[in-house]
Amino acid sequence: QFVIMHPPYWDIIKFSDNINDLSNSHTLNEFLDSFGMVIDNTTKYLEKNRYCACVIGDKYANSQVIPLGFYCMNQFLERGFLLKAILVKNFGETKGKSNQQGIWRYRAITNDFYIFKHEYIFIFKKVK
């Protein structure tokens, strides 16, 4: 058994109009509480000593980094999972930004934000 989760990065992209959709969470705490419920509802089927991965990146808002990946990592740790690895997946050009590096660089400089080129893959072991 191996569970892979790739949740929305909070409200960066809206996936639906459903109020239960994680991407429609109004606050960071609401998002994390809801993600915690997803962990509980999913990993209850995962047997002891099996593994789970969470693929997620961070968010940039109000001129600061919101370490969403590490907040989500903590949701697993609070539930007794062991953190076995943190992998950093680097990516250069995504399909949505292909051949548009110049405009994104300009937007980042003029609007005071950072262009992320990575996301995390957290590997956990269920021990309870």
Residue ranges and their predicted role:
Residues Q1-K128:
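Class I S-adenosyl-L-methionine-dependent methyltransferase catalytic core
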